Amino acid sequence: MPENIIAGIPVHFPFEPYEVQRAYMEKVIMCLRDGTNGVLESPTGTGKTLSLLCASLAWIRTRQSEQQQYMQKLQLDQQKQATGGAGAGVADLNAVMGKANNWGVPKVIYASRTHSQLSQAMRELKRTAYANMKSVVLGSRDQLCIHPDVMREQGNSNKVNMCKLKVHAKTCSFQLRVESKKDHPDFRGPSIMDIEDLVKVGQRLKMCPYFASKELVNGADITFMPYNYLLDPKARKANKIELSNTIVILDEAHNIEKICEESASVQIRSSDVAMAIEDITHIMKIFTSGDAQDTGGPEEPKDFTLDDLTLLKEMLLELEKAIDGVVVDNKAEGTTYPAAHIYELLGKANFTYGNCATIVALLDKLVQYLMVASQHSTMLRKGGSFMVLADLLNIVFANKEDVMSKVHRSFKVHVEIEDNKQSKNAANSAKPQTGWLGKGNNAASSVTKAAKIINFWCFNPGFGMEQLLNAHVRSVILTSGTLAPLKPLIAELAIPVAQHLENPHIVDRSQVYVKIIGTGPDREQLISNYKNRDNPKYISSLGQTILNVSRIVPDGLLVFFPSYPMLNQCVDAWQASGLWADISCRKPIFLEPRGKDQFTSTMEEFYQAIRDSKGACFMAVCRGKVSEGLDFADRNGRAVIITGLPFPPLKDPKVVLKRRYLETNRTKENQLLSGQEWYNLDATRAVNQAIGRVIRHRNDYGAILLCDARFQDMSQVQQLSKWIRGHLGARPQSSPFGPIVRELRQFFKHAEQTMAQPEERVVEPLLQTVCKEEQPTLACASSSQITIKREPGTGGTKFQLASELAAQAEMANTIKTWTPADYANAAGSSTLGRRAPDAMDFMSRLNANVTSIDFNSADAGQDLVKIHKRERSSPTASESSMIAKKRYKLIGNGPLKTEPSEPATTSSSFCPTPAQSQLKEAPESRADFLREVRSVIDCDQFRSFGKALLAYKTGGDGCFETLMVLLLDVLGAPQLRYLLLGMRRYLKNEHKLEFDVRLASFQAT
């Protein structure tokens, strides 16, 4: 690889670096050389991660070489002075050793927000000349553990405790093999191992990947880990992370302030305390009944005594009493107290700095005890309430008494009323069905009273960064594509910063089209503020804008909304008006789901749909998963539409207190933002992050459309990334919609003619699903292998398998209700990620796991489509290939094209004959039933059918009459009677008898 001298250090880069990459690497090396901190912004697509890794590891390698040469020189000098006497030699050796310890080569800790981002960084490292340097990634037990008993546990905390239990009892064979297998060539090989590689090697060697990875840390030049391992003191201690003389790199640091604040904040509920009291009471009953189970060997002393339990229960009862006594003046919004209130509250129950460590140790032992006991009884919880209490004590008493004045300025206690249903659910979710307590027990009353939530919130992110500096790190480098403006970030983190950088983008101006769209095609102002967001004219105009843009933008179109409620509101309105169908005629629409399982399959479907000539449209939310670090390079994202500014909820207690904290602590010296400036910046940073989904590399191109008139405000523009500001000019103004359409069309025409079109790309899997030997039916699926429509039981990702099992359960012969999700599925949405929707919520599109909604049609004037199965490509194809190739073909509502050998008419191609109908039964699945209805009636009839169902679900008895008339009209033909009969199961109970009478009368005629 080419060698470049940057800041005096030879750096091997995979290619000749661009100027922005040189500038970036120079800043990194200067930080490492001088032992200073840096805040570096470089837009997504400029090779930031590659530059960061190459620069830091080049400096490390140079230091290693220099130290090796220095030590060799000292050894030669000592040999020459060997005749000078033993005393002199010992003195020289001591001096050399002392200097060497102080001069040791630093190690790199590379931290990012998610494991997928860490995996991406490790893939970048494999491309470099530094791929042979020692590296390791730290992951959770949830990702690395291969013990079947641990993996069966639900929730990360239960897995952690089960693992600790087995290790303590020496019953985990995988962990016991670590010592004998840790030097195996497969494990110590030169290749870089990410999470999946560690799991595969662990399975092959029958060795625990979680504990084995820790064996590599001491010898590693660079260690990859998520933020919480670094910033959470408890996680740092558990993973034995040494920070002294290390280089800490925080990549994707645009949310670092919030992460620091959250790592120092904690919450406890009245129901948590009540459950902890119940758990202790039950353990005491076991002890007094003589059934106690000792987790240790027969000769080991008990980990705790009955006296320990009695004392802890008394303390918890006092804590419960103290929480009950807290006054909440404003029951709607809660009441705020100074930070000292949490210490007073805990002090009433005798929780203090002096006994905190002892109590936390006892709580850990109780969790271990319950983990053992719960293996023998399903009546027991697993100590979740003890873990909540331990977290509270660890965080509250982590701040030393000598910094209490700073704690009082930076923390607040906010007390809310715990929703009665919520507290009961919390108590009942893990509570044994027969109950543990007698009627007179004091603990039971806490849930039925006005239960409370005690929040201990940190508003000073400098606390987290101060911990790193106090651990004597060499350098801290914060970097991201969206850090601007840098000054307020540096001020909030309160760390000395010697190097800062705001890089321009790597692409030419002609590759990016940026415009503010202040009005829609109908000249209605586009402004998504609180007053206007419910305006039907605004919502319609926004939909018309997206429709017009979708006609021009090739391939992938991303649309970001300020919030989920706003996305829901627009979807509902556009579906009612027909705009949704019009947009989906141009591009199939995908919605960002909230669940993890559905998210992966949805993204894979979207990437697959991009290969179609129409492309696809993805509607997502700022600050959601799609806006954070996903790859929409090239065809996957040719344009991004920002529909509004995602301001945080103005009256949210945490937002109110954050603004108040800034106003109170702001001075000319510390340069903190005002509360309003912070509020505006929080929204703009989310916009910057969403914009960064497009333009992912040097040869990429795309459009950025800011569809909110407020983007014209200079105060808002100044907070956008520097490279975006360059495209908007000194005085940004919105342009009329007509000229924008012409310019946008010309932009893409010119780009397609002048830019090299990308080759077909294989998108990396979004969430790496680790293949476990214990689960042979779960196969890892990359996007290059994904099959959009599959038969149940044919393999695929564990998310897909879970979805199929849910779908199979849904097909049980029970009375079910209709939801709009079913209506959408009938019109072509994916079956992946489907679950039984809320029976009472007719408008729960986004709460249901609908992964994609595609009302695609060949005719822009038609709203819906017919769905047919594609024929097998070959009669001799194998069974597996037939399954893999199975798709639903989306076609228009016009005449169907037929094979030459078929009759010319098409009516019989989708309407069964009377003879056929005698043999047919209506599909059990709602979605399949709707698809069949859709395939046998025309577009207008199906639209009326859907509206009648919606009206019936939400309306009164009169709506049944309307529905009945329509059913007899559209499904009354003899060959469709099986569908008419099938409708009975979806009716309300009070209408079924009348349905039977009407149907009998209809058949008689």
Swiss-Prot record:
PROSITE patterns: HELICASE_ATP_BIND_2 (PS51193). InterPro entries: ATP-dep_Helicase_C, DinG/Rad3-like, Helic_SF1/SF2_ATP-bd_DinG/Rad3, Helicase-like_DEXD_c2, HHD_RTEL1, P-loop_NTPase, RAD3-like_helicase_DEAD, Rad3/Chl1-like. Gene3D superfamilies: 1.20.1160.20, P-loop containing nucleotide triphosphate hydrolases (3.40.50.300). GO terms for molecular function: 4 iron, 4 sulfur cluster binding; ATP binding; ATP hydrolysis activity; chromatin binding; DNA binding; DNA helicase activity; DNA polymerase binding; metal ion binding. Residues 893-917 are annotated as: Disordered. A motif (DEAH box) lies at residues 251-254. It catalyses: ATP + H2O = ADP + phosphate + H(+). Residues 7-322 form the Helicase ATP-binding domain. Its main location: nucleus. Its EC number is 5.6.2.-. ATP binds at residues 42-49. Keywords: 4Fe-4S, ATP-binding, DNA damage, DNA repair, DNA-binding, Helicase, Hydrolase, Iron, Iron-sulfur, Isomerase, Metal-binding, Nucleotide-binding, Nucleus, Phosphoprotein. It is found in: Nucleus. One of its GO terms (biological process) is negative regulation of DNA recombination. [4Fe-4S] cluster binds at residues 145, 163, 172, 208. GO terms for cellular component: nucleus. It comes from the Eukaryota. The modification Phosphothreonine is found at residue 876. NCBIfam families: rad3 (TIGR00604). Belongs to the helicase family. RAD3/XPD subfamily. A probable ATP-dependent DNA helicase implicated in DNA repair and the maintenance of genomic stability. Acts as an anti-recombinase to counteract toxic recombination and limit crossover during meiosis. Regulates meiotic recombination and crossover homeostasis by physically dissociating strand invasion events and thereby promotes noncrossover repair by meiotic synthesis dependent strand annealing (SDSA) as well as disassembly of D loop recombination intermediates. This is Regulator of telomere elongation helicase 1 homolog. It comes from Drosophila virilis (Fruit fly).
